[in-house]
């Protein structure tokens, strides 16, 4: 991917949810909501504070993150869908 986010922005690829329930029922595309979990694929350098210092982002490439339903801006790059969002849009990191 040839896109580098600026400042405190992060690029996230949504994690696809299963199309079958645990009971074996198929969930059609029209009934599924977009997942609110994804993987960080790129991070910016950090946010510049009022004092002029750059404060680094607490996330790194590969982190699994949770975000709000309406967080970020959707973009399509090289045939894939991504979200560009600010660090503040991230609700938490899923620990392994």
Curated annotation (Swiss-Prot):
Pfam short name (any one): Cpn10
Family annotation (CDD domains): cpn10 (cd00320)
Keyword DNA-binding tagged: no
PROSITE patterns assigned: CHAPERONINS_CPN10 (PS00681)
Keyword Chaperone: yes
Keyword annotations from UniProtKB, A to Z: Chaperone, Cytoplasm
GO BP annotations, alphabetical order: chaperone cofactor-dependent protein refolding
Subcellular locations according to the entry: Cytoplasm
Highest taxon, organism lineage: Bacteria
GO molecular function terms attached to this record: ATP binding; metal ion binding; protein folding chaperone; protein-folding chaperone binding; unfolded protein binding
Complex formation: Heptamer of 7 subunits arranged in a ring. Interacts with the chaperonin GroEL.
Family per record: Belongs to the GroES chaperonin family.
Job of this protein: Together with the chaperonin GroEL, plays an essential role in assisting protein folding. The GroEL-GroES system forms a nano-cage that allows encapsulation of the non-native substrate proteins and provides a physical environment optimized to promote and accelerate protein folding. GroES binds to the apical surface of the GroEL ring, thereby capping the opening of the GroEL channel.
Name this polypeptide is given: Co-chaperonin GroES
Record lineage: Bacteria, Pseudomonadati, Thermodesulfobacteriota, Desulfuromonadia, Geobacterales
Gene behind this protein: groES
């Amino acid at each position: 991917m040839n896109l580098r986010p600026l400042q405190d922005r992060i690029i996230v690829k949504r994690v696809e949810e299963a199309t079958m329930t645990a009971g074996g029922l198929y969930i059609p595309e029209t009934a599924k909501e977009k997942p609110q979990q994804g993987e960080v694929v790129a991070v910016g350098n950090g946010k510049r504070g009022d004092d002029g210092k750059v404060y680094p982002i607490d996330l790194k490439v590969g982190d699994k993150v949770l975000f709000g339903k309406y967080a970020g801006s959707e973009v399509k790059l090289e045939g894939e869908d991504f979200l560009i969002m600010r660090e503040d849009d991230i609700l938490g990191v899923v620990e392994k």
